[in-house]
Regions:
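Surface-exposed beta-strand-turn/loop segments characteristic
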Residues: 11-59
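Short, small-residue-biased leader/transition segments that mark boundaries at the very start
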Residues: 2-9, 252-254
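Glycine-centered secondary-structure boundary/capping sites
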Residues: 3, 16-19, 36-46, 141, ...
């Protein structure tokens, strides 16, 4: 028995550059982008971001195969395999936020599942069930070109984000789970005695380097242009925020 399924779900269009009723100021946003491109060129970098104007989407491809085999009247064997490939794009803008294309990221999750079972009957009072399974999961975020995250607030009544999304610059999780279980059941009168074992082996690889290429946050366009033009007041004290809920983070506001 086999099965294949494909699903694609487009969702409403985000607000983009020049969108009507958007709270951010598109003209000021373009000035900020032009200043960043000019700064990159002066540093010898070829960096040309563009404004994002994409639909949000969710896609998935699924496939499965199952085989049942009656070996004989005392033994039955089954094996099944399933596969799920799911994708969705995140990091889109809103009515009050405008982002570049490399701020968007695609979250992709691929899962393979393999399971096998052997049922054996040795006598009217003695039977055995053996099971094995393997689950392979690969979760990954696909980010844009290597570039820092630059966020400027109070651009009109919204904010502008240029560069990569801070938590997607290096983010991935690999999981491999092996399971073996065997149960021998002995029927004795009105009683059933089960002797067995259950074993699981896990392997995880987690990549998470937030703000790998750097992150810069500005309270206003004027603060941003002051830094770019070298006219910022260096006597200001930087503010920090530290939190601890399972992890610690530190952010600097310029």
């Amino acid at each position: 028995m086999t099965g294949v399924q494909t699903c694609a779900l487009p969702i409403s269009t985000q607000y983009g550059y020049g969108s009507e009723n958007a709270k951010f100021d598109s003209d000021v946003a373009q000035q900020i982008m032009d200043a960043i491109v000019d700064l990159a060129q002066r540093q010898g970098l070829d960096y040309h971001p563009s404004w994002a104007n994409e639909d949000k989407y969710e896609k998935s491809n699924k496939a499965s195969v199952k085989l049942d085999w009656n070996i004989n009247e005392f033994n039955k064997f089954s094996i099944r395999w399933s596969y799920v490939d799911a994708k969705r794009n995140l990091g889109l803008g809103s009515i009050s936020s405008l982002y570049t294309t490399n701020h968007l990221y695609e979250f992709q999750s691929k899962t393979h599942t393999l399971a096998a079972e052997l049922q054996s009957r040795f006598s009217p009072s003695l039977n055995n069930e053996a099971r094995f399974s393997y689950v392979r999961v690969r979760d990954q975020r696909t980010s844009g070109a290597a570039a820092p995250s630059i966020v400027v607030s109070n651009v009109g009544k919204g904010s502008v984000g240029i560069g990569n999304e801070g938590y997607s610059m290096a983010n991935g999780l690999d999981q491999d789970v092996y399971t073996f279980e065997d149960n021998l059941t002995w029927l004795r009168g009105s009683h059933a005695f089960t002797f067995g074992t259950h074993n699981e082996v896990y392997k995880f690889t987690n990549l998470f380097l937030p703000n790998l290429y750097g992150a810069y946050t500005f309270n206003s366009p004027q603060d941003f242009f002051d830094v770019v033009n070298g006219t910022a007041d260096g006597s200001k004290i930087a503010s920090y925020a530290v939190t601890q809920i399972g992890r610690a983070s530190c952010r600097e506001r310029v």
